[in-house]
Amino acid sequence: ISTVAKALKQSGINSLLLSIDAFHREHISLDKVYLFAKAVSDECISGFKLHPAWVVKREEHNKYNEETEECLNYFVDLQIPITQGNNIFPSGNAAIYLSEFYEKKPINLSMKCGEAPYTERLDNVETIAINPNGDVVVCCFIIGNIYCDNIIDIVGQYNPCTNPMIGALINGGVRELIKLAEEYEITVDTTQFYSACDVCRNIVKRLSLRIT
């Protein structure tokens, strides 16, 4: 653990958010996370903060938020700053396992990437994610793999205009993506989803098998 913390310090990293919440505790014991947090804190890495995730919002009273508060208290002696955290929205597993906490509302299908929380325009990307298998991801689109190509090349070669799904989202939002899916005989029942993002991810997953 100390070796990893020192490596992070040497890399020049200037922002590090450590997920602390009820959901991560199900898979990783707080004792182990505490040791990592202390090691990073001892290295004085700038921008190191604890980053919780809240069901609906922090002020909402439910068992998951109560457990997350308990998790944060576990680290109180380290005096690590805490971010406001993320408000979980019902998409993916959250829509399956946390549906009781959310109400289905009419979905704005004209919504474009960058208008929903935690999203950005696909033609003005500032954030990427790298999955454990090396996939480089922009939102839910895989644009390369670091085990196959250099990350600089992957980012430099990203062109949203070459992907018809991205083009549809940029031009007309989720509604345009649905039209594209229908051209490939893919039907979408939007009443089964909680958000435009959830509709989008479902279509992209299914449509990618037809287009690529």
Sequence positions of predicted segments:
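Alpha-helix boundary/capping residues
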Residues: V40, F75-L78, Q157-C161
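Accessory C-terminal segments flanking Radical SAM cores
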Residues: G85-L209
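Flexible glycine/acidic-rich beta-alpha junction loops that bind and position SAM and/or redox cofactors
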Residues: E26-I28, W54-L109, I143-N145
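Radical SAM/AdoMet-radical enzyme domain recognition
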Residues: I1-F75
